[in-house]
């Protein structure tokens, strides 16, 4: 296995779509959330990372889709902060409700399309 590729948790859930959260240090520190969908990774840059309370929203800037090899990619400026699988609960043009099942458990989020950007919200109702 090349030195910049790691095994992902999602491999133990082969029928579930994977996600990865990258800790990206350049051009300025931010996180990238990538959700497997339709053979690509839909991606959002998170300048302040994942929300930690349901009372806050975090800006999520949609960026171009990435190839599936980014599930395991890291380099000197990008590390894998978390990985696992995700499940969608509801979707409309303006909102995606989903749960990330990562290394520290399951957390439910909503991605809300504001028209110009997205907001990432940690929901009050969390997965059991």
Regions found by a protein language model. Give the residues of each.
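A charge-rich, low-complexity, intrinsically flexible signal that marks solvent-exposed coils, linkers
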Residues: 1-128
